[in-house]
Amino acid sequence: MKLILLILTAYLLGSIPTGLWIGQYFYNINLREHGSGNTGTTNTFRILGLKAGAATLLIDIFKGTLATLLPVLVGASNVSPIAIGFFAVLGHTFPIFAGFKGGKAVATSAGVLLGFAPLYLLFLAAVFVLTLYLFSMISLASLTASVVAVISVLTFPAAHFLLPGYDWLLTITIVVLAAIIILRHQDNMKRIKQQSENLIPWGLNLSKQQPASHH
């Protein structure tokens, strides 16, 4: 029973459509009708600006972290934190409060790792920032960090680097989260191939993307 409640709470936490609600309540803007139509951090930054984007990022990360820490907070020591965190990502991606159309799972996945393996998250964040600097694309940075996450979760424990030993639940979760993130970025990948992906005004844009101007 406790397990079902934890899963449900994590899913509902994850389901909070931060960007969508911030847009509606504070700016009177429906994010689905602007930019990429996505309700995650990137589109929130692009359409509503820095404050709203930062708030969305932090809250979306916090959703994952809080969900991951739920078993600890309620003293359910036999429940795996990472498994509960996973349901927050599921909620974030398919939110019950927003017609099951959610974000691309990046921020909330980061939040889950922050609660479970913070140093490992720091490593992936470094990969993300480096890729972002070299190519100026949030999508490519997310995809690269996801692929590196899968490779590293399979190899690091062998070297006892950042991850002490193999944790099959963490491994499965990372692989599934990476798969969700990659699947949610299909459109971005097409644009990267066509060299028309949206850029951020930072970094080197090494792959010379030339996005069409925004409508």
Curated annotation (Swiss-Prot):
Annotated HAMAP family: PlsY
Coiled-coil residues: none
One GO cellular component term noted in the UniProt record for this chain: plasma membrane
Source organism of this protein record: Streptococcus equi subsp. zooepidemicus (strain MGCS10565)
EC number assigned by the record: 2.3.1.275
GO MF annotations, alphabetized: acyl-phosphate glycerol-3-phosphate acyltransferase activity
GO biological process: phospholipid biosynthetic process
Subcellular location: Cell membrane
Pathway annotation: Lipid metabolism; phospholipid metabolism
Keyword annotations: Cell membrane, Lipid biosynthesis, Lipid metabolism, Membrane, Phospholipid biosynthesis, Phospholipid metabolism, Transferase, Transmembrane, Transmembrane helix
Cross-referenced InterPro entries: G3P_acylTferase_PlsY
Function: Catalyzes the transfer of an acyl group from acyl-phosphate (acyl-PO(4)) to glycerol-3-phosphate (G3P) to form lysophosphatidic acid (LPA). This enzyme utilizes acyl-phosphate as fatty acyl donor, but not acyl-CoA or acyl-ACP.
Self-association state and partner proteins as the record states: Probably interacts with PlsX.
Protein name in UniProt: Glycerol-3-phosphate acyltransferase
Reactions catalysed: an acyl phosphate + sn-glycerol 3-phosphate = a 1-acyl-sn-glycero-3-phosphate + phosphate
Keyword Glycoprotein: no
Lipid biosynthesis among keywords: yes
Topology of this chain in the membrane: Multi-pass membrane protein
Family: Belongs to the PlsY family.
Transmembrane portions of the chain: 3-23, 42-61, 68-90, 110-130, 134-154, 162-182
One Pfam family it belongs to: G3P_acyltransf
